[in-house]
A protein has these predicted regions:
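Intrinsically disordered, low-complexity regions enriched in serine/threonine
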Residues: 2-182
Length: 182
């Protein structure tokens, strides 16, 4: 219970979840705009929830996951070289970091390590036990890699996740898994 302004200011300074509103001339319009933004966000959240639930029903074999991850991380030329070198097991060998394959098809160890870490997250990541073998599990491995495994820290990490390459790769991963599910 707030008794005085000092107590209110002290409580607000220590609070972790609060919104301050200044009563300016445009407060009414800003509140209405905020309500519209919240409605759009809630609608988007419901649509996303429905999509993610659908992805949990789509089965993906390990070979499909290898191909999915490789198609996200590699260039078309690299994919073509893998398919020419070993059309049957190329993706699996790449994800397992077969160094002879890496050298033969000229793929950097950085990309191979990313693929290996994504597959490792797919098999053993947080919460993956129940969704392994599904399209949702494959997509979650990509997002989990960028959010939990990638080596960026601090502001660089946040910028990458929100606006940068990690965000672009996660959007690309979502589009690819939705295309697979269709």
């Amino acid at each position: 219970r707030v008794i005085c302004t000092n107590m209110l200011n002290g409580a607000l300074d220590k609070a972790s979840c609060h919104i301050r509103l200044r009563h300016t001339k445009s407060i009414k319009e800003k509140l209405e705009l905020g309500a519209q933004v919240l409605k759009v966000a809630c609608s988007h959240a419901l649509d996303a929830q429905e999509l993610y639930r659908h992805l949990t029903t789509i089965k993906m074999s390990d070979e499909d996951v290898y191909k999915y991850l490789c198609e996200l991380q590699l260039t078309p030329a690299e994919i073509e070289r893998i398919n020419q070198y070993d059309p049957n097991k190329g993706y699996a060998r790449l994800v397992a970091r077969d160094y002879r394959l890496l050298e033969a098809v000229e793929i950097s160890s950085r990309k191979a390590n990313q693929l290996y870490n994504m597959m490792d997250y797919y098999n053993d990541g947080i919460g993956q036990k129940d969704i392994c073998g599904t399209a949702w599990g494959a997509y979650n491995a990509v997002t989990g890699f960028y959010c939990n495994v990638a080596n960026l820290e601090g502001e660089k990490r946040m910028n990458s996740l929100v606006w940068g390459s990690a965000n672009n790769n996660m959007n690309k991963a979502l589009n690819a898994v939705v295309a697979y599910a269709s």
